[in-house]
Amino acid sequence: MGEDPRQALEVDVLFVGGGPANLAGALRLTPLVAHHNQGVSRGGGAGRMLELQIALIEKGRDVGAHAVSGAMFDPVALEELLPDYQNRGFPLSQRVSRHDFRYLTTEGGVRIPHVLLPWARRQGRCYLGSLQKLNLWLAEQVEAAGVYVFNETCGVEILYDKARMCGVRTGDKGVEAGGGKKANYEPGTDICAKVTVFGEGPYGTLSEDLIHRFELRDGRPPQSYALGVKELIRVEHAGAPGVAIHTIGYPLGPRVFGGGFCYGLDDHHVAVGMVCGLDWDDPQMDVQAQLQRLKKHPYIQRFIKGGTVVAYGAKTLPEGGYFAGAPPLRGRGDACRRLGRIAERAVSEGHPLCDEERDAGGRDDL
């Protein structure tokens, strides 16, 4: 028997993944198109009027469903995207009131002066809070701007037209664990796009397929990764709202790259986590066990003593050396800013969305 017929959906721009970076890219693209059209209508802009269909697919039940609470967010990118974000129900309210960077020893530690860490001075602008709530709020702003957001929709295969990528096939629904079809079976959709933006995370299945197919890593240093584990702890006593702690040293040895963090999200919730580079050579190394040791340190205990773990999670992270990885301890804001600028280039620098000379059926990727 042949394949069940699949529906095809034509869009101009497809974002794969509902993380902060992709949401920011989609949010940035819509006003850029409006600005472009205004310029064309007034005779002061080049090109043609654009009427873009923009879509974003997210595999989770809701955007943010796979995010673990407890993150530091720099609003600098959001101020560029939505200058009035505070009037739109922005879900984070806890500003960083105190930021410490500490080198921990077995029982104590020393505070590293901010004069040695110039980038740390900006942390007072940051917010602490739930990444899940932030993503969900960003998705609401994106939908309000006219972007189609499809939850519970997983990209399983990249579509190619000869040597060019032309979209993504989504996964079938209503499939049994053994592969059989349930009564509610529904074949996936072929979403065809002129521009596709992959924001799947550090080791996305589709992104890796694209990288291997077009040999994007050839001649480049291998990508390094880290593993992060995090717990959200509820404390009965007054916690330390606004306190952001980053640590190096204990419990990690000199041969393991990484560190810990402790964020006071509100009066009764503290996020504690540990991030370790995945290049360790100790077969007994266990990041979760290292997190438990960090939690027992006297300095961390003052924030979480007597608390109860109410949520936990783990995730791989891309690493890029000191200059790319250490300063931005507020990565969600940086990711938003970078993807927003990529979206801007997509409109302004000759991608097929704006190129009158190219075949309308042309495809491109970012």
What residue spans do the PLM features occupy?
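A short, basic/flexible loop-to-alpha-helix module at the beginning of a structural domain
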Residues: 1-10, 38, 46, 179-188, ...
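Beta1/beta-strand and adjacent pyrophosphate-binding region of the FAD-binding site
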Residues: 4-21, 55
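Active-site-proximal substrate-binding core of FAD-dependent oxidoreductases
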Residues: 43-51, 341-347, 359-366
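Conserved Rossmann-like nucleotide-cofactor binding loop
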Residues: 21, 62, 203
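N-terminal FAD cofactor-binding segment of flavoenzymes
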Residues: 28-33, 39, 43-108
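FAD/FMN-dependent oxidoreductases across multiple families
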Residues: 256, 282-353, 357
